[in-house]
From Swiss-Prot:
It comes from Sphingobium indicum (strain DSM 16413 / CCM 7287 / MTCC 6362 / UT26 / NBRC 101211 / UT26S) (Sphingobium japonicum). This is HTH-type transcriptional regulator LinR. One of its GO terms (molecular function) is DNA binding. Belongs to the LysR transcriptional regulatory family. Residues 6-63 form the HTH lysR-type domain. SUPFAM superfamilies: Periplasmic binding protein-like II, Winged helix' DNA-binding domain. InterPro entries: LysR-type_TF, LysR_subst-bd, Tscrpt_reg_HTH_LysR, WH-like_DNA-bd_sf, WH_DNA-bd_sf. The gene is linR.
Length: 303
C-alpha cells in the first residue's frame, strides 16, 4: 500500500486522531464505529510507513512524523472545504468545527463561557476544547494546527504568531473580610499575612513577573502554599486565612461568589494585556477569522 491508496476520508480521520490522540475519541467525533477508526489508522500507518500514534503513560502520543504532517493535513482539508463551497460566502451557521483554545484555567473560564454564549445561535454546530500547554508547546501547537488560538499574556510568542489585544488586566489581593490586611490595606499587614502564590512556571505567562515579585518581597515563611491554578488558589483562600494576589477582572467576579473581599496590592504589580494569538497561516481562513472577530467583540465588550 502507498499514499495513493488513501482518500480524503483517511485525511479526515488522521486529522481527528492527531488532535484527539485517541482512536475512540476520534471515532466519536466523526461518528464512526471504533473498529472502523482502528482499521483506518492501520491503513494510514501502512500507507505512510509510520506508527503515527504510539502508546504513552497517559494514552497515545503522535510520532515526530505525525507532528510534522499535522499542519499539512489540516491545510488540505481546508482547501477541500473551500473547493466544495465553490466560492460561496462563509456562513457561521453552516460551520461544523471544534476549535481548540490554549490558555490558563482562568483564560479558559472567560473564553469558553463567552464563546458558548455568543456563538450558540450564530454558529450552533461549533464546539470548543480547552488545552493548557507550556510556552514552547504552545508555539509548536499553533504552528501545527493542534491549537487554533491561545488566549492570555505570553510575551515570548513571537515567531510566525499573530496577536491582538483583548483587554487590560490588573492585580488585586483577595481574602476574608475580617483579615487584618483586608481591613487595613497596609504594607506591614500584607507582609505579616500568610499567602498563597500561583505559579505559572514553564508557561511563559506574564504572571511570572508578579509571581517573582511576591516570592522576592514576602518572607519565605509567609508563603504557605504555591498552587498551579488560580481557581484552586481561590478555593483555598476561601477555606483559610490566606491572601491571594491574582488578576482582578476574572478572579474578582468569582471572589464575590465566595464572599471574599479585594484590596489593592501595597507593592507594585504590573498590569498586563490579555491577547489572542494565532499562527499566520490561519490569518485569512474564514472560520478562523470569524472566531477571532467574535472573541474580540465579546471580550473587549465584557471585560
Amino acid at each position: 500500500m502507498n499514499i495513493d491508496d488513501l482518500d480524503f476520508r483517511h485525511l479526515v480521520l488522521l486529522d481527528a486522531l492527531l488532535k484527539r490522540h485517541s482512536v475512540s475519541a476520534a471515532a466519536r467525533e466523526l461518528d464512526l464505529p471504533q473498529p472502523t477508526a482502528s482499521h483506518g489508522l492501520a491503513r494510514l500507518r501502512k500507507a505512510l510507513g509510520d506508527p503515527l500514534l504510539v502508546r504513552a503513560r497517559d494514552g497515545m502520543e503522535p510520532t515526530p512524523r505525525a507532528e510534522a504532517i499535522a499542519g499539512v493535513v489540516q491545510q488540505l482539508l481546508e482547501l477541500r472545504r473551500d473547493l466544495a463551497e465553490g466560492g460561496q460566502t462563509f456562513s457561521p451557521d453552516r460551520l461544523k468545527r471544534e476549535f481548540i483554545i490554549a490558555g490558563s484555567d482562568i483564560a479558559h473560564l472567560v473564553v469558553l463561557t463567552a464563546l458558548h454564549s455568543a456563538a450558540r445561535f450564530e454558529a450552533p454546530h461549533t464546539s470548543y476544547r480547552a488545552l493548557t500547554l507550556s510556552g514552547d508547546e504552545m508555539v509548536s501547537a499553533l504552528e501545527t494546527g493542534h491549537v487554533d488560538i491561545a488566549v492570555g499574556a505570553y510575551p515570548s510568542l513571537v515567531a510566525g504568531i499573530k496577536t491582538q489585544r483583548l483587554y487590560q488586566e490588573e492585580y488585586l489581593c483577595f481574602g476574608k473580610e475580617g483579615h487584618p490586611f483586608i481591613k487595613s490595606g497596609e504594607t506591614d499587614d500584607f507582609m505579616a499575612a500568610d499567602h498563597i502564590v500561583v505559579s505559572t512556571k514553564g508557561m511563559a505567562h506574564a504572571h511570572r513577573a508578579v509571581e517573582r515579585a511576591l516570592l522576592d518581597k514576602i518572607h519565605p515563611d509567609r508563603i504557605r502554599i504555591v498552587a498551579s491554578s488560580f481557581l484552586v488558589a481561590l478555593a483555598a483562600c476561601f477555606e483559610s486565612d490566606l491572601i491571594l494576589t491574582a488578576p482582578a477582572r476574572v478572579i474578582g467576579r468569582l471572589a464575590e461568589v465566595y464572599g471574599l473581599r479585594a484590596v489593592r496590592p501595597p507593592i507594585l504589580m504590573e498590569a498586563f494585556e490579555v491577547r489572542q494569538y494565532w499562527h499566520a497561516r490561519n490569518q485569512d481562513d474564514p472560520p478562523h477569522r470569524w472566531l477571532r472577530q467574535l472573541l474580540h467583540k465579546v471580550l473587549s465588550a465584557r471585560m
